[in-house]
A protein has these predicted regions:
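Small beta-barrel nucleic-acid-binding modules, primarily SNase/OB-fold domains
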Residues: 1-178
Length: 178
């Protein structure tokens, strides 16, 4: 570390240092991992280096991969989460992905590793889990986000924080009949 950076650090206070943010920034990205229908890892170029960030699609919620064991419709939710996750995989790769297949993490990473498709993300704030909230787009003109596509086609519902829906029975049964 050079002497100028050391002096900068020594003079730092909570009042004179900005908090790191990606808010309102647009990036070209590549999806390298998908956890569920609204959570994935993307690579972006920042300061001439490639970084990976865990990101969550903003404004939506999808079924959980690991719902609480006490949930009455747990098995239905797990099946619906696979369908939602695979729909996101289909969107980010432009590949014919079987929505009902329970792909392993390794299989998903292999699909994403060979995929060369680049996506556009518009960043928001970081959530309570440290994930950057993003709108995900196919093109840089960001006409229609994947977030909205997932909602419009029944793979997600609108969600802006706070208490989540308790009863998803009709939502899950719709997904399980896709």
């Amino acid at each position: 570390m050079n002497e100028d950076n050391i002096k900068l650090l020594q003079s730092s206070t909570s009042d004179n240092v900005k908090k790191f943010s990606l808010c309102d920034k647009m990036f070209i990205s590549k999806c390298i991992s998908i956890y569920d229908g609204d959570s994935a890892t993307f690579c972006i170029v920042l300061h001439n280096q490639i970084y990976k960030f865990n990101m969550r699609l903003s404004g939506i919620d999808t079924p959980e991969m690991r719902p609480l064991k006490t949930k009455p419709n747990r098995d239905l939710e797990k099946k619906a989460s696979i369908i939602s996750r695979n729909k996101l995989l289909q969107l980010v790769t432009d590949q014919n992905i079987n929505l009902h297949t329970a792909y392993s993490k390794r299989e998903i990473k292999n699909i994403l590793n060979i995929n060369k498709k680049l996506l556009y993300i518009k960043c928001g704030k970081f959530d309570k889990y440290g994930r950057c909230l993003v709108k995900l787009y196919n093109t840089k003109d960001h006409i229609k986000s994947f977030n909205n596509i997932l909602v419009e086609n029944g793979y997600a519902y609108k969600y802006y924080g706070g208490k989540k829906k308790d009863d998803f029975t009709s939502y899950f049964s719709h997904l399980n009949h896709c």
